[in-house]
């Protein structure tokens, strides 16, 4: 076999594996969405979504080693965006940190940029919520001033 033929064969095999994996993950996402309606436990939901996300990113990093064009895949970007947004829907700092850990599986700048944008939106929404609560005196002013800082030990 010539090197180009070998590469083409590997490329076709990986493309097939990628499409099968993506279709399985999309099916899993539908199951997760159905699960959300039945069960309101956020932790279980996040664990399921993170497992799916990890599977996507591992597949992605494996494919990127063979084809650098993989990162420009629109369907992949949409899939990753869906995963990130589903995790951020819970509005928890923990899910954001888990998303950040997921980014380490890949060098995708699109995913990194998406995470940064979502992080900024998350922080802004939290600050607005705290400011609103402070106006109605439902939380202490101290909590509003130091909302994202750990209390210093005196």
Curated annotation (Swiss-Prot):
GO terms for cellular component: host cell mitochondrion; host cell nucleolus. One of its GO terms (biological process) is symbiont-mediated perturbation of host apoptosis. Keywords: Apoptosis, G0/G1 host cell cycle checkpoint dysregulation by virus, Host mitochondrion, Host nucleus, Host-virus interaction, Modulation of host cell apoptosis by virus, Modulation of host cell cycle by virus. The keyword NADP does not apply. Residues 80-138 are annotated as: Mitochondrial targeting signal. Residues 134-154 are annotated as: Nucleolar targeting. The keyword Transport does not apply. CDD domains: SARS-CoV_ORF3b (cd21649). It is found in: Host nucleus, Host nucleolus; Host mitochondrion. Its main location: host cell. A motif (Bipartite nuclear localization signal) lies at residues 135-153. Induces host cell G0/G1 arrest and apoptosis. Interacts with host RUNX1 isoform b. This is ORF3b protein.
């Amino acid at each position: 076999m010539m090197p180009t033929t070998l590469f083409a064969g590997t490329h076709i095999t990986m493309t097939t594996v990628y499409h099968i994996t993506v279709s399985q993950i999309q099916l899993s996402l539908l199951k997760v969405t159905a699960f959300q309606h039945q069960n309101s436990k956020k932790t279980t939901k996040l664990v399921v979504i993170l497992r799916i996300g990890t599977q996507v990113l591992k597949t992605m990093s494996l494919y990127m080693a063979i084809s650098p064009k993989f990162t420009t895949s629109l369907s992949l970007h949409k899939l990753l965006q869906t995963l990130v947004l589903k995790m951020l829907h819970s509005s928890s700092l923990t899910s954001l940190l888990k998303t950040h850990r997921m980014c380490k599986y890949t060098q995708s700048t699109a995913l990194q940029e998406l995470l940064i944008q979502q992080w900024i939106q998350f922080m802004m929404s939290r600050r607005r919520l705290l400011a609103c609560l402070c106006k109605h005196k439902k939380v202490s002013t101290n909590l509003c001033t130091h909302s994202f800082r750990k209390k210093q030990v005196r």
